[in-house]
């Protein structure tokens, strides 16, 4: 199996797709407007956990800046269920947007997301929020009995994405040094 890197684009692209609706659902507010960014390789544990930390800071709960902006705007019914980090492919993607919107709101949703991210860059996020997300991330990564599978199988599944993409599967399980580095980075 050989997985190639995703195609790189020199500028943002817009993709418009359609899905069928039942006649009873024809109210005009069925559009999903999402933006996504291609991030680094999944088999880099530090980059992967950093991306998970960033996604958590932005979208973890209603107090998170991007989640709050999406929940409190009137451009759709709710944040898209696609929001978050996808680290199951060779390269990670970060996705955010709205569901229950209209095509006419596309630019407004994009502007909201970009301006919120720019505000986060300018104003930052409270240190205690970052530390709370890191603590939660650490607990999720080290959790032994919380999943629906036996612990050993959970470890194997955690390392599978890295192994499939020719990364060091055992290194993907060596969380302590990476979590310590993240803690010192923040």
Model regions and ranges:
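Segments forming glycine/polar-rich beta-alpha architectures that bind adenosine-containing cofactors
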Residues: 177-186
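Non-catalytic beta-strand/loop surface segments
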Residues: 1-45, 56-107, 111, 126-154, ...
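C-terminal, helix-dominated tail/subdomain
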Residues: 145-178
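Conserved short hydrophobic interaction patches
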Residues: 112, 116-120
């Amino acid at each position: 199996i050989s997985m190639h890197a995703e195609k790189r684009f020199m500028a943002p692209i817009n993709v418009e797709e359609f899905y069928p609706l039942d006649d009873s659902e024809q109210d005009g507010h069925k559009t999903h407007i999402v933006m996504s960014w291609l991030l680094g390789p999944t088999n880099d544990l530090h980059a992967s956990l950093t991306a998970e930390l960033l996604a958590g800071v932005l979208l973890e709960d209603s107090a998170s800046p991007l989640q709050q902006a999406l929940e409190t705007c009137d451009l759709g019914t709710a944040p898209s269920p696609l929001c978050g980090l996808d680290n199951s492919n060779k390269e990670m993607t970060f996705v955010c947007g709205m569901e229950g919107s209209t095509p006419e709101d596309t630019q407004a949703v994009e502007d909201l997301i970009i301006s919120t991210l720019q505000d986060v860059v300018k104003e930052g996020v409270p240190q205690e929020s970052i530390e709370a997300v890191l603590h939660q991330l650490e607990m999720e990564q080290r959790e032994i009995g919380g999943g629906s599978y036996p612990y050993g199988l959970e470890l194997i599944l955690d390392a599978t994405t890295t192994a499939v993409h020719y990364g060091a599967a055992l290194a993907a399980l060596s969380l302590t040094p990476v979590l310590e580095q993240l803690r010192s980075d923040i």
